[in-house]
């Protein structure tokens, strides 16, 4: 709920942006496996309204930083090209070390913005440093509202206003939790909640209310 990060989400996806999901990616030395090259997103590749941001983006906060050995690699610009034939790219490169791919290199505490359509993957962590990434993503509301979900991060379902609002309460709770932790900071004003006059307070009841909130992940 960092106000600067949520402001970035609004600048990319509009002030009525919707949450996607949250996850930890842990890649320990020697046992962190490879993740094959892939593009995220399943629902909008053939949409008449397809554009480079239609499947949203992820913030990737690096706890210990990331290196070329333990980090994610990306192929710049591929988020604009639609669904790619990855097998052809591997064949053209002669290996899974794709031509033009670059690693995401970060210091501890750095936050990366990664478009979900960008071709990305990672190699086995053969180094000596762990990578822990706190991943949290956001969508344009128009990308999820009334859309049948992809059924990957949550059960396939149509994301109606009620579902989107229910999933978005996590943002409200997070904003209040941060305000309690940093009382001198100006909290982010999340338009869908403030315009509806809805206020969420972070307390013991909130923990119970958030139980299994991820079952409503807006998976597109």
State the predicted function of each range.
Residues 1-108, 121-130, 136-150, 215-220:
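Non-heme Fe(II) oxygenase catalytic core, chiefly the N-lobe of the double-stranded beta-helix
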